[in-house]
């Protein structure tokens, strides 16, 4: 096993091969990575079967689905890499140019961060997405996968590095930490001088640990306590469609709805319909029904478990939905501000003034009017695959694509000027 220190030194030694690579060279490397990923399908699936067998009974079915790979999912991962090829190279982009009175020409241009560390849980597609985005944005990457997905991740990284071996980019620009203990995560948090940026992707425990302990710069990809508010002026059919999509299409992802707020004028009509759609209809279709966590007012209209205070602060990542009835738009916004993780929140309304109030007052990375929160995604936003959803305001916010993985520098050109 290569030590963490050796890996940090290896990636530092080769980072220039990617930091200054041309767009053509990077695109050739990405295509080679995608091709080798597909070529290694058999090996990746064998590794994934080991991870799935070890995880069965230890994590929920929803989380098992995150971990699971088949040939179609591997092809989708390769397609995601190829889509990054089509994106414009951000490196070298001139952001601003100005000329001073003394003749100095100052150019602000986009540059790579250097080496980016990613700590993430059991999602194999993060491995290929992170490798593709960091490479196209001119960065080397150190990956630290969750233990549940390690065999799969190792097989994926092996394939990606074999792809790089056919190019002029050194394969060591992609590093996988072999130690999946907590100590390896903490070592990355303290790797000042080796990592220029650290991005955690996972649950609240992981993200909080990184934010609280890291001495290297961190972008917080926050958990998603995502709200949908059904206003008194909502179109109910539209609301039901949005709720269904936001909750059931993929409940294990961070942009899935966890809390439903319903105006009291709509509760009696929409909640029974919601119960029919999310419970009875799903049972009849052989699908897992939604389990409700209901406040006292909501429980008058549908059956479910009484909500506890913590239910409105929980990212369930499962077929569970907390429901609260509110008396006004202002109460809905106040609730969101008290409980939101500032990821994605939505209002369903036909009232333009209510929509404007909601979008002005709700301080989240993505705020929706009459649309599902499931659109908070780099691919859906036209950014290609994403590194995560930032819930902070510095240095990036919302879905992080290529530009969010870069910095800038000033190039100052003169003709012998000196400062008086």
From Swiss-Prot:
Pfam families: Aldedh. Keywords: Amino-acid biosynthesis, Cytoplasm, NADP, Oxidoreductase, Proline biosynthesis. It comes from the Bacteria. Its EC number is 1.2.1.41. It is an enzyme of class 1 (oxidoreductase). Pathway: Amino-acid biosynthesis; L-proline biosynthesis; L-glutamate 5-semialdehyde from L-glutamate: step 2/2. GO terms for cellular component: cytoplasm. Its main location: cytoplasm. It is found in: Cytoplasm. GO terms for molecular function: glutamate-5-semialdehyde dehydrogenase activity; NADP binding. Transmembrane segments: none annotated. Disulfide bonds: none annotated. One of its GO terms (biological process) is L-proline biosynthetic process. Catalyzes the NADPH-dependent reduction of L-glutamate 5-phosphate into L-glutamate 5-semialdehyde and phosphate. The product spontaneously undergoes cyclization to form 1-pyrroline-5-carboxylate. Belongs to the gamma-glutamyl phosphate reductase family. This is Gamma-glutamyl phosphate reductase. It comes from Streptococcus pneumoniae (strain ATCC 700669 / Spain 23F-1). The gene is proA.
